[in-house]
């Protein structure tokens, strides 16, 4: 019998090469995002079924981050680039997240039958208490884009005690006027539903540039298997009522609010007008340069930074959590008392595209930011 010999095999390339601490951290982050697929639920409401996905576990005495997407999108296509951004992990590890898909917008949703009465924007807002009751959540920090921002605002007006803060991107609080309707009808004669929705989501400059992002979202919407459902959500949004915000009146948002819009975005004027109607001691206004119509897609880093300071101002993240940002950013802040000598202050923060931060502390001021 041949004698057994011990043979030593050396790997040509190590399976686990040495990693720097930074690379190891990035790998850990990627693995955590990959493994955390969320749990999807559906709940029946008086206006039909609604689907939502929950990430993380509830944290004691902390609100849930609660998102609502815009027309033509679902929660993934609207929010994934933001919530999967590296620095955002500092925030989401401290909160449970609830991502709502408007009825018929969830992945794999069947097309509604002909003649289906899609919920109004007010009715979509009235579905939210059913979700929170199902999850046994008492308060939220809402993050909404476009139609989702409108829906969360309507909910906050009806249930102010359950909303601790709102981040409203591209909000238009006004109902469509006759001129808007005429323009909408005229556009409908010459443009398809996907093109009209793309014009709602992105600026004309972005659409003309036809970047990879635009090509991706044009394809997603044009070839969506639930395009009929998307059109119903679109019509619901275009039939919205005026929120009737009034500075100093009863119809106003009573929680801290951060308004966000891209410079030259389709909804820039509407967001500026909304800012003029809200309580200046509770409202921050973030106008983002070079971000187009969807800043959560094009500038997730800048929006993450703003969101961190917004949450910190609400008292939910200690300043020690901000050390990484503090090392990598510099701020230029000018504060001035208001002309009428009232207690509210106006703060203007100038940011270049490379550096700048939002001021920390409670959101007791109106803040206009260009970044």
Curated annotation (Swiss-Prot):
GO terms for cellular component: cytoplasm; growth cone; nucleus; perinuclear region of cytoplasm
Task of the protein: Contributes to the regulation of the Wnt signaling pathway. Down-regulates CTNNB1-mediated transcriptional activation of target genes, such as CCND1, and may thereby act as tumor suppressor. May be involved in dendritic cell and neuron differentiation.
SUPFAM superfamilies assigned: alpha/beta-Hydrolases
Source organism, top-level taxon: Eukaryota
Modified sites of kind Phosphoserine: 326, 328, 332, 335, 338, 344, 350, 352-353, 355, 370
Main location: cytoplasm
Record protein name field: Protein NDRG2
Pfam hit, one: Ndr
S-S bridge residues: none
Presence of the UniProt keyword Cytoplasm in the record: yes
Signal sequence, renumbered to the chain: none
């Amino acid at each position: 019998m041949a004698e057994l010999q011990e043979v030593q095999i050396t790997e040509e390339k190590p399976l686990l090469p040495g990693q720097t601490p930074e690379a190891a951290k990035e790998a850990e982050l990627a693995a955590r995002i990959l493994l955390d697929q969320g749990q999807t639920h559906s709940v029946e409401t008086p206006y039909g079924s609604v689907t939502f996905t929950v990430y993380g576990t509830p944290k004691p005495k902390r609100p849930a981050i609660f998102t609502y997407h815009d027309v033509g999108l679902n929660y993934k296509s609207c929010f994934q680039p933001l919530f999967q951004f590296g620095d955002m992990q500092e925030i989401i590890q401290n909160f449970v997240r609830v991502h709502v898909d408007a009825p018929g917008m969830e992945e794999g949703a069947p097309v509604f039958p002909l003649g289906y009465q899609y919920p109004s924007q007010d009715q979509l807002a009235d579905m939210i208490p059913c979700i929170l009751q199902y999850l046994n959540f008492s308060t939220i920090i809402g993050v909404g884009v476009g139609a989702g921002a409108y829906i969360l605002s309507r909910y906050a007006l009806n249930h102010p005690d359950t909303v601790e803060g709102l981040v409203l991107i591209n909000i238009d609080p006004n109902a469509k006027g006759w001129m808007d309707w005429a323009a909408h009808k005229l556009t409908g004669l010459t443009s398809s539903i996907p093109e009209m929705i793309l014009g709602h989501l992105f600026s004309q400059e972005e659409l003309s540039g036809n970047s990879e992002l635009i090509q991706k979202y044009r394809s997603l919407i044009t070839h969506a298997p639930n395009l009929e459902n998307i059109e119903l959500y679109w019509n619901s949004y275009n039939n919205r009522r005026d929120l009737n915000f009034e500075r100093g009146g009863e119809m106003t948002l009573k929680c801290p609010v951060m308004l966000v819009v891209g410079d030259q975005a389709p909804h820039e004027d509407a967001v500026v007008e909304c800012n003029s109607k809200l309580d200046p001691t509770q409202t921050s206004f973030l106008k983002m340069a070079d971000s187009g119509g969807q800043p959560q897609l094009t500038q997730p880093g800048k929006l993450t930074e703003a969101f961190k300071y917004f949450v910190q101002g609400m008292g939910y993240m200690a300043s020690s959590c901000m050390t990484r940002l503090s090392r990598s950013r510099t701020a230029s802040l000018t504060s001035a008392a208001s002309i009428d000598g009232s207690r509210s202050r106006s703060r203007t923060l100038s940011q270049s595209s490379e550096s700048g931060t939002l001021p920390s502390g409670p959101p007791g001021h109106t803040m206009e930011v260009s970044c």
